[in-house]
Amino acid sequence: MRNSVKKWGVGIAVFAAIVTTAVLLPQDKVTDFHEKYEGTDLTSDIKGMERAGTYIRYIAGHDSSVRPQENVNIELFDYTSAKDVERYTSYEGVDEALYTGVDSTVTWQINVPQSGYYNLYTEYLIPESRGVVAERIVYINGEIPFESARNITFSRIWTDGGEVKVDNQGNEIRPTQKEVFAWQKAYFRDDRGYEAEPYLFYFEKGINELTLEAENEPMILKSLELKSVQDMDDYQAYLEKQPGVNMTETGTSYQQIVQGEDSTLRSESSLYAKYDRSSPTTQPNSVTNTVLNYVGGEAWRSAGQWIEWNFEVPEDGYYNLMIKARQNYARGSISSRSVYIDGEIPFSEMKEISFEYENDWNCMTLTDEEGTPYQFYLKEGTHTLRLEATLGGVGSILEELEDSIYRLNQIYRKLLIYTGVQPDKYRDYNIQQVYPEVIEAMDLESKRLYKIVDEMVAYSGQKADNIATAQTVAQQLERFVKNPNKITLEFTTFKDNITALGTASLNMSATKLDVDYFVVSGINAPIKVEKAGAMAKAWHEMKSFAASFVVDYDAVGDVYEEGDEGVIKVWILTGRDQGTILKSMVDDTFTPDTGIKVNVEIVAADALLNAVVAGRGPNVVLSVGADQPVNYALRNAAEDLSQFSDLQDVLSHYTASSYEQYRLDDHIYGIPET
């Protein structure tokens, strides 16, 4: 009896301890490191460890409050020197335009009426070329003002090259992408996204020289000017400038759903429509067929990338905006977007809207801090909504982190010269005496990193794995300062931690996001918030599981019965995107021209051998290793291509060395893949 009572007592005590821990743990405050860097001037530099040429230093070199209010137009054809340029007349609706080629350098003399900071602004068109962004280097009075002015980028415009097709299995096939050659307006900005605002360029009063040098891609300029720096209106100022209207019930109850996959324009060809079967609330939805139902994903990750949609409103008035999006890529991170309506950010709050980490879709109405929906004034007719990836508040933190990584590499290189790659752990290098500035730099950099950790945690609300790397380096530097003898013992680890910090910085600059749809609605229209419950998710998984027994997810495009005469089975060992492109090319040209039907299937590389042994292999396989054709030929499992009379015609497109590895005893068993 006593043993039973004793056991019950121990059990109750353990249970009480668990409950107490569960209650108290959530109340713990997230500790910060402010005590480590408070009172320290983190802007100071250690001689020999500073980073020159940064944008922050450039801005600090002049009075940033001097911002003239007058724009300065630059006459494009009044250049003082130029190379690889041409004057166009009557081009794309413009009377005159200046073509600047891939090797171009153009210099203008500008009479600036007042000293101060200006934005550089241009209207441009990128003609047909390699399909990548255009890049220009900016010189002011013969000098590059700051390092990142070496890489000013200008995006292209892409759209769908046709309608969405449906194969004979009911699967949607996305159209190819084609480029749109149209005029665009752009400020000169930070292509990394660290600076959310356009770059500020300082010009002295009087005659100044401005030079644009091409890094790649031609550009055609319609206009170029120095724009006065203007502060954007906040929401209240925006509302005060809008007219008062009496909307009818048609307008106040209006609602239009625009699917994410129906975007009209995009900045890169990779931002096309995708399909998702993971959530029951994705619209439209199918567990058996490939249905294009969202846009974004891994490709929509870099600052400056944008996607644009068209929408309509029935009358002049005020409308709300809701975006159904998902950020399930990085726990502890925030993906941000700038909202443009008809090419302009309507008010300052739309410079950055944030999507926090969540496994499922999040229906987010654009609201103020109190939860009141923003009202956007729109005139009757068609409008555009553009979402542009931005780093937002995290950009300045990442800029500090990049500077810190640069200085850490300087510290490492200085020590490397002295100690070598593998320091002798039994030798006292007296680093604190030989390089006292290195110890001082380590102490300062440790405090800077602690501050960066605090800033990132304050921004995101939690400490993610990537920023924890910065804390690891800060703690290591702190150990080095307290005991310099540890430097040589942990030298390899120090190098690895710097590398890991660089990787973490790249990961944190990725701002991925999916968009299912957005809703434009009148101010009285109810907005349905879709959220999948446990039962809906369970039913969705059951349907997906059942479908896996009857649906061939490996097949791509139109599928023909293998018993049909003249059907060729082709296996491709890469991804579905490559398979879809191949199947589209086959169906568009090869099958109509030859009458030969082709089934394309996506197959794992390790399945090929088993299939061949079982007698169920393909007629053609693509993307195999270079050694495989001969390996299969040795076992009489590959076809000798030498028997075909037109083989030499095919091989004439290749150099002999490219297919020599597929030769065995004067027979050819494979063709290079291009």
Which functions belong to the PLM regions below?
Residues 109-111, 127, 227, 310-312, ...:
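Structured segments of extracytoplasmic/periplasmic soluble domains
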Residues 524-566:
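Disordered inhibitory propeptide/activation segment of secreted metzincin zinc metalloprotease zymogens
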Residues 564-632:
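Early extracytoplasmic/lumenal segment of secretory-pathway proteins
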